[in-house]
Regions:
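Active-site metal-binding loops of divalent metal-dependent hydrolases
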Residues: 44, 112, 315
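Alpha-helical cap/lid subdomain in secreted, periplasmic
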Residues: 1, 33, 91-252, 256, ...
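Serine-esterase "nucleophile elbow" of acetyl-processing enzymes
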Residues: 31-78, 94-106
């Protein structure tokens, strides 16, 4: 007996087979792409900065990518002047949350602007500040991500300043007439406690960024610690002809130094991230995330007679020719290549 099959009868199994093939391809693609993303939310001490016109300010989050191999992507969403409250109310948190995928990480660091008195930003430790931190943690976990809480980096405050908090927005030291002592003085108070408390309560990794940066600045002293910050004399750098006295925000050297220390602390607690940890002597990038934006300057800074590894990030580069006496090894990252 001859059985006739309609086009519809044939289409059904073909559709099923096609669906299965596409599913297998999708799974294979997912497994092949083993990169994970570290999302970052926070304020100006972490944020990416405008580097045009030789501007020197950097957030430590700009430099974090230097300390991971190509298996980790750092996606920094920190924004100048934001508190945990304004970051949520402006829709910035939703935009980040929509991008988070299972297996990703989220670094949360607020406090500098939660201290501000204006209603758009102010939160209170123990109540509204803690509630916002819990929300970040809970919603990140719901997306399959691993949240990481940090408290605020320290302000360089060696005097009995009453204006240190307000000076963040001014990018100035309104108390520069006060004599500086030898001991760093805290300006954050209970805003340092909330991230630790929420981390313990919710079983989240906590990095004490305040202690780490406090110890760094204290060890460098009241004069040496100026090298970390946006403290320039008039005419010292073209982008600041009148100079600047900013004890909160980092310059290139400071941001890179802090990023390295916080990455070390992070990798000590998160084994999966530690697998991707890398360290090089010098970092070069055209997007402001390096210590230098050109190879010639990077090579010139390398000491003679000592092996130095220079990481070159992204883009096309001309390999320097004049390297007499320099034992330099280049490592190309993020798709960088020599012409």
């Amino acid at each position: 007996m001859k059985i006739k099959k309609s086009i519809a009868d044939l289409a059904a199994p073909l559709h099923t087979i096609l669906t299965m093939v596409l599913a297998v391809l999708a799974i294979s693609s997912f497994r092949a792409d083993k990169t994970k993303t570290i999302f970052m939310i926070g304020d100006s001490t972490m944020a990416n900065k405008d580097i045009s016109g030789d501007k020197q300010e950097r957030g430590w989050g700009m430099m974090l990518q230097n300390y991971f191999d190509d298996g980790i992507i750092v996606d920094n969403h920190a924004v100048n002047g934001r508190s945990s409250k304004s970051f949520i109310n402006e829709g910035r948190w939703k935009a980040v949350l929509d991008r988070i995928m299972p297996g990703d990480y989220l670094i949360i660091q607020f406090g500098h602007n939660d201290e501000k008195t204006d209603s758009a930003r102010h939160t209170t430790p123990g109540t509204t500040f803690d509630a916002n931190l819990r929300r970040f943690v809970r919603e990140a976990r719901e997306k399959g991500a691993t949240p990481i809480l940090m408290n605020s980096v320290v302000r360089r405050n060696f005097s009995d300043s009453k204006t240190a908090v307000a000076d963040d927005d001014l990018r100035d030291n309104s108390s520069k007439q006060l004599a500086e002592g030898d001991t760093l003085i805290d300006t954050h108070g209970e805003y340092l406690v909330s991230p630790r408390r929420v981390a313990k309560e919710m079983g989240v990794v906590f990095v004490d960024a305040n202690k780490i940066t406090h110890d760094l600045e204290q060890s460098m002293g009241k004069e040496g610690s100026k090298k970390l910050h946006m403290i320039f004399k008039p005419g010292e750098t073209p982008s600041l002809p009148d100079g600047r006295q900013d004890n909160t925000h980092y310059n290139i050297f400071g941001a890179n130094k802090v990023a390295g220390l916080l990455d070390d602390a992070l990798c000590r607690q998160v084994a999966e991230l530690a697998k991707h940890h890398v360290y090089y002597d010098i970092y070069v990038s055209k997007n402001g995330s390096g210590q230098f934006d050109d190879l010639e300057s990077a090579v010139a800074s390398a000491p003679k007679g000592r092996k130095v590894t220079i990481a070159v990030s992204g883009g096309e580069w001309k390999k320097p020719e004049a390297m007499k006496g320099k034992k330099v090894k280049f490592v190309l990252t993020r798709g960088a290549k020599f012409l």
